Amino acid sequence: KDTGSEVFAMGYPMADVMGSEVKFTDGKISSKSGIGGDVRVYQISVPIQPGNSGGPLFDMGGNVVGITSSGLNRDYFKSENVNYAIKASYLKNLMEACPEEIILEERVETQVSSATLTDRIKQYEGYVVLILTK
């Protein structure tokens, strides 16, 4: 994806406080690299919180283009909406390197142009799950 592309995330930020309903946030790809020029990640303006990490980052066509991962420390860097997502292409390589076989279905990018964004969110929220750990 290119810098300036519109993207959105879905997840369960701070589920213990904000509840267990899936949340939607949107923004843009601010840069095609992260801290120190790390090309494995996108810098995104999508607001993410603890609990969004590991959730999907979608393009406006409904394709998963990344997985939300982190943000700059707001107190230390005095920054807002400087967050990161691991690019989907690097996740595919990681999954293929796993010792257990993971079958990945190749697919062509889709365009869900006829569905409204609210309809797409309703469709995708069934695939975004909350995982709790002890």
Where are these regions (language model features)?
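Terminal peptide-recognition signature
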Residues: G4, A9, I29, I44, ...
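Sec-exported extracytoplasmic/periplasmic mature domains
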Residues: Y12, G34, N63, E96-E100
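Small beta-barrel nucleic-acid-binding modules, principally OB-folds
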Residues: V39-I44, L94
